[in-house]
A protein has these predicted regions:
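Residue-level signature of catalytic and energy-coupling elements of molecular machines
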Residues: 92, 131, 225
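Walker A (P-loop) ATP-phosphate-binding motif of ABC ATPase nucleotide-binding domains
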Residues: 99
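Hydrophobic anchor at the beta1->P-loop junction of P-loop NTPases
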Residues: 102-104
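Conserved P-loop
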Residues: 112-194
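Conserved RecA-like ASCE ATPase "motif II neighborhood" in helicase/translocase motors
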Residues: 200-224
Length: 225
């Protein structure tokens, strides 16, 4: 947004509160370029991070975001470390948005944030019944050949990122290099962490993308990594 956003739109600006969120209705030529579910922000003395809820010609409605960088809003013990991660968590935790794509370099937290959001909405809010994780099984380098076992066991070599992120989400914050830990990691010591990991694994199914054709998923949180 332009630095003088509030001054520029002050004449026709409407605002109201609903469910701890602040909403703004703005009018002007800028609105024509805004798209629904697009994020807008401005820094400075009056910082603003918002999501475009309605875009109709020269009118738009903005909804302020939940600040997931604050510990009180942590998602399964994970907090946003920058503006982009806060945007991602607002998308992943929004019940009105059914399809989210995240693009970023390796190590920017895409899988971690997605998995934390999935666990919260499956084990805490009960919005979903289980989590399904899949990815394309394309090897880097030489193929390791045919693998024995079930479909899930065959997928194990491609699920290293999942295991790494589950370790972070089930580790107390004081033991984590990032200073962040899982929601239930601090309850019950080692026994509690083991029980939590068992509970998590019971709700996570690993599937191969090669066998997805024709499937219909009801009440599932689907992650394509």
């Amino acid at each position: 947004l332009p630095p003088n956003f509030f001054f520029f739109f002050s004449k026709g600006l409407e605002s109201w509160k609903k469910d701890s969120r602040t909403y703004y209705r703005i009018k002007g030529p800028l609105c024509a370029d805004l798209m629904v579910n697009e994020f807008v922000w401005q820094d400075g003395p009056q910082p603003l991070q918002a999501l475009v809820k309605v875009s109709a010609g020269k009118t738009a409605e903005l909804e302020t975001l939940i600040d997931y960088s604050h510990q009180k809003n942590a998602v399964w013990g994970i907090t946003a470390r920058n503006r982009e991660q806060n945007f991602a968590l607002n998308l992943l935790m929004n019940p009105d948005i059914d399809f989210v794509t995240l693009l970023g370099q390796a190590g920017t937290g895409k899988t971690l944030l997605t998995l934390a959001s999935a666990l919260t909405q499956t084990l805490e809010t009960k919005r979903f019944a289980e989590i399904i994780i899949t990815r394309v099984t394309v090897p880097v380098g030489e193929d390791i050949g045919f693998l024995p076992g079930t479909e899930e066991e065959k997928m194990t070599p491609w699920m290293g990122a999942l295991e790494d992120n589950l370790d972070v989400l089930n580790k107390p914050a004081e033991q984590s290099a990032s200073g962040q830990g899982g929601q239930a990691a601090s309850y019950g010591g080692d026994w509690g962490r083991a029980a939590t990991m068992d509970l998590i694994r019971n709700r996570i199914k690993v599937k191969s993308l090669n066998f997805m054709r024709g499937r219909t998923f009801m009440n599932k949180f689907l992650i394509i990594d």
